[in-house]
Regions:
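Bacterial N-terminal signal peptides
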Residues: 15-17
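Short, low-complexity, Lys/Arg-enriched N-terminal segments of secretory-pathway carbohydrate enzymes
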Residues: 1-2
Length: 297
């Protein structure tokens, strides 16, 4: 009897030890996000709330920095979704917000605790369902030091700046911090792309940091335009893309696919996300059958 009890105790201890080892192995990285916003009317729109909630599912805290002012009553919307928020016109676009959010994390001790940081902005409706599968997939890419959702080859291969993730060895490097803190006001908005988005990837790559995108860019080579966001239905339906660029519903982004089919697919995928989008876009983009659903809501 004593031997059996001793054996049972040994098995229990071994099981607990194994469980603890597995738990340590799969421990979620501590992650903080900087979200860059812009509110010309001084309000927080529903799609932004959705985005912040999505980030909170994969991050331990979100810093919200807007390049605009905010009506005092609107700040209530941010209090339970952020660890810090700033709303001031700094005139450095999203990159100025990234800079300010990054430095707040640094000055308040969060970077010391962080394994990863996210830079994201409000140029997309996201997530369509959840960011979790994307982060689970990219966690397997142990070779990467930083990554983006999608890359572009215009000018040079680079991750697009509306969603980027950096591991500790990158964001703690003086080269990265120098680049971020060198962000300045530009006389034309296109310069934020050519000076910062286009240059960051090769700049970090030059120091030996490895990168890639969640969307398999080489596999997408059959889509002719280097801006793959011009094929939103393909990305969402075939590749599980969690983002829809807001510019799709303007004249500033060339689209090669049917937006009616896109909206119908989003409605089937996640009706609540569809309604977020429908409340923001011009009425004439919405197919008649979906207008009825919107009006009946």
């Amino acid at each position: 009897m004593f031997k059996q009890q001793k054996k049972l105790v040994f098995v229990i201890i071994a099981t607990i030890a194994l469980a603890m080892a597995v738990a340590c192995y799969i421990k979620k990285p501590k992650r903080y996000a900087v979200f860059a916003g812009y509110n010309p009317d001084g309000t927080i729109h529903p799609y932004v709330i959705t985005y912040l909630k999505g980030l909170n599912e994969v991050a331990d805290g979100v810093v919200y920095v807007a390049d605009s002012t905010l009506k005092p009553a609107e700040e209530e919307k941010l209090k339970n979704l952020t660890i810090h928020y700033e709303n001031i016109r700094h005139e450095e676009y999203d990159w100025g917000s990234y800079k300010r959010g990054f430095n707040w994390l640094k000055d308040n001790g969060y970077l010391e605790k962080a394994d990863e940081i996210i830079f994201a902005n409000d140029s997309c409706y996201a997530p369509l369902t959840s960011f979790k599968p994307m982060f689970k997939a990219m966690a397997k890419r142990k070779d990467l030091d930083f990554w983006g959702v999608l890359q572009n080859t215009r000018f040079n291969p680079h991750v697009q700046s509306y969603f980027m993730v950096f591991k500790k060895n990158v964001f703690s490097a003086r080269q990265f911090q120098h680049f971020i803190n060198a962000v300045r006001h530009q006389v034309d908005s296109s310069l934020y792309i050519t000076e910062y988005e286009v240059k960051l990837t090769p700049y970090l790559e030059n120091f030996g940091f490895k990168w890639d995108s969640y969307m398999p860019y080489q596999e997408l080579s059959y889509l002719a335009d280097s801006e793959k966001n011009s094929y939103p239905l393909t990305l969402v339906k075939k590749y599980g893309y969690q983002f829809i660029k807001r510019r799709i519903f303007t004249s500033s982004l060339l689209i090669y696919e049917d937006t009616d089919k896109l909206l119908r697919y989003v409605y089937e995928l996640n009706p609540e996300r569809y309604f977020d989008i429908a409340s923001e876009i011009p009425e004439w983009f919405i197919p008649d059958d979906l207008k009825e659903k919107k009006n009946a809501r």
